C-alpha cells in the first residue's frame, strides 16, 4: 500500500468515449484507442514524456494486434522509445490491475512516473482457425470467435458464457427480471443525464477516426443516447429461455481505452505536477470460477479494511456492471447507499470494453468525486475465472 509519508498518487486521467459494437470506434484498433488515452493523460498531467519510465496497459483480446500492444500504445502516444511497456491480461480487471502494478512498482521505488490503463476493441477481435497450424487435411473446419473464446466464455465449462453464471447468481440472490430491469432503467437514465449534461467532460478525450467518408471525431459515449428505456422490459432473455438477464441488464460489447498517470507524492511535488488523488489501498479476491459475480464483495471488504474505512465512510462507489446483478449483489451485501453507486450510470448503459473497464471506472470515480464534492471512493470489478480487484482512492 501507499506509505503515509509518501503515498502513490494519480496526477491525471483520461479515457476515450465508449463506442458500441461495430459502431463509432470500429475504425480504430485497440492500440490506437490506447494511444489516444495515454497521450491525453500525459498532456493533462503536464509531464514531459521523457520522465515516464514504464507503462502498463490492460488488453484481453490481443489476437491480431501484433507484438506488444502496450508498447504500440506507448509509441503511438509519442512516448520516448526508452519507456518500458507491459501488456496486462487479467480479464475484466486488466485495466485496474495495470494501476495496481503501477502502484506497487512506484511504492517499491522501481520507477518514479508510470502510465497505467487499458484498451480494447471488441469490434476488431478476429476469428480463429485453431486447427490450421497442422492443416485441416480434409472436410469441414470450424472458426472460433476470439472475443467469445478468450473473453466471454468460461475456460472451465467450454461454451458456457459468463451470462449463464450471472443467471445462476440472480437466482441465488432472488433478483428477478423486474428488479434487474429496474436497475438497468435507472442506470440508463443516469448515463443519459451524464452525457447530455457534460458530466463526463473531465474524463473524455476525443478520438479521431479516418473512414471512407473522411475524418470523423467521436467525443461522447455512443450507446446511452441510442438506448430506449421503454424497450428494456420487452427484450428476450439472452442466456436462458426463462431467465431474467437480457442485453439491457448486461454490459454491452464495446470499444474504448483509459489511462492514468501515477507517481509518488514527493515526485509530484518536486516536479510541480497536479495531484488529483492518492491511492489508499487495493485488494483482490479469488474463489470458484462460477461465482465470479460475487467476488467484488470480499475484494471490496479487503480494500476497505486496508484503508481503515467503513462502508459509510465512502462517498462514491463504482462497481463494474458486467451484469446488473453484480452491482446489485455488492449493494445488498455491503449495504451500499444506492445514491452512492455508479452515479453516472455503469457498463449496462455505457458499455464494457473488457481490457479497459478497470481503468475507465477509476477515471469515472475520480471525476464524479470531483464534481460532487466527495473525497473517498472505491472501485471494483468482477473477473472471469472467479476473481475480483478493488481500489480505494481519496481526492487530495
Language-model segment annotations:
Residues 165-167, 200-203, 209-211, 280-349:
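Active-site pocket-lining segment
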Residues 9, 15-16, 26-35, 44, ...:
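N-terminal extracellular/periplasmic Venus flytrap/periplasmic-binding protein-like
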Residues 88-120, 170-199, 259-266, 331, ...:
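Active-site-proximal alpha-helical scaffold in enzymes
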Residues 2-65, 69-77, 81-84, 165-177, ...:
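Conserved active-site "lid/cap" helical segment
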Amino acid at each position: 500500500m501507499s506509505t503515509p509519508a509518501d503515498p502513490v498518487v494519480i496526477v491525471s486521467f483520461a479515457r476515450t468515449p465508449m463506442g458500441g459494437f461495430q459502431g463509432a470506434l470500429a475504425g480504430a484498433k485497440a492500440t490506437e484507442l490506447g494511444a489516444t488515452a495515454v497521450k491525453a493523460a500525459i498532456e493533462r498531467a503536464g509531464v514531459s514524456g521523457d520522465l515516464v519510465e514504464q507503462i502498463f496497459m490492460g488488453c484481453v483480446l490481443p489476437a491480431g494486434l501484433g507484438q506488444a500492444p502496450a508498447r504500440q500504445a506507448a509509441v503511438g502516444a509519442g512516448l520516448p522509445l526508452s519507456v518500458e511497456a507491459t501488456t496486462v491480461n487479467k480479464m475484466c480487471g486488466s485495466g485496474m490491475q495495470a494501476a495496481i502494478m503501477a502502484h506497487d512498482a512506484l511504492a517499491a521505488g522501481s520507477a518514479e512516473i508510470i502510465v497505467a490503463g487499458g484498451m480494447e476493441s471488441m469490434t476488431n477481435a478476429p476469428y480463429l482457425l485453431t486447427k490450421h497450424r497442422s492443416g485441416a487435411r480434409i472436410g469441414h473446419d470450424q472458426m472460433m470467435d476470439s472475443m467469445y473464446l478468450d473473453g466471454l466464455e468460461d475456460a472451465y465449462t467450454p461454451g458456457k458464457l459468463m451470462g449463464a453464471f450471472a443467471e445462476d447468481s440472480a437466482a441465488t440472490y432472488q433478483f428477478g427480471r423486474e428488479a434487474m430491469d429496474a436497475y438497468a432503467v435507472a442506470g440508463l437514465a443516469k448515463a443519459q443525464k451524464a452525457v447530455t449534461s457534460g458530466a463526463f467532460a473531465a474524463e473524455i478525450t476525443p478520438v479521431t477516426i479516418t473512414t471512407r467518408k473522411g475524418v470523423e471525431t467521436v467525443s461522447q459515449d455512443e450507446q446511452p443516447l441510442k438506448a430506449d428505456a421503454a424497450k428494456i422490459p420487452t427484450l428476450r432473455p439472452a442466456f436462458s429461455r426463462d431467465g431474467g438477464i437480457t442485453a439491457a441488464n448486461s454490459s454491452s460489447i464495446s470499444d474504448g481505452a483509459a489511462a492514468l498517470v501515477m507517481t509518488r507524492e514527493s515526485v509530484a511535488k518536486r516536479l510541480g505536477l497536479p495531484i488529483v488523488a492518492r491511492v489508499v489501498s487495493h485488494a483482490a479476491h479469488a474463489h470458484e470460477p462460477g461465482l465470479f459475480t460475487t467476488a467484488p464483495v470480499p475484494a471490496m471488504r479487503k480494500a476497505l479494511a486496508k484503508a481503515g474505512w467503513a462502508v459509510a465512510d465512502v462517498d462514491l462507489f463504482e462497481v463494474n456492471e458486467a451484469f446488473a446483478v453484480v452491482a446489485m449483489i455488492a449493494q445488498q451485501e455491503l449495504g451500499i447507499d444506492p445514491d452512492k453507486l455508479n452515479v453516472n450510470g455503469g457498463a449496462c448503459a455505457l458499455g464494457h470494453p473488457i481490457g479497459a473497464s478497470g481503468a475507465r471506472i477509476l477515471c469515472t470515480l475520480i471525476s464524479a468525486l470531483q464534481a460532487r464534492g466527495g473525497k473517498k471512493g472505491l472501485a471494483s470489478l468482477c473477473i472471469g475465472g472467479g476473481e475480483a480487484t478493488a481500489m480505494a482512492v481519496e481526492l487530495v
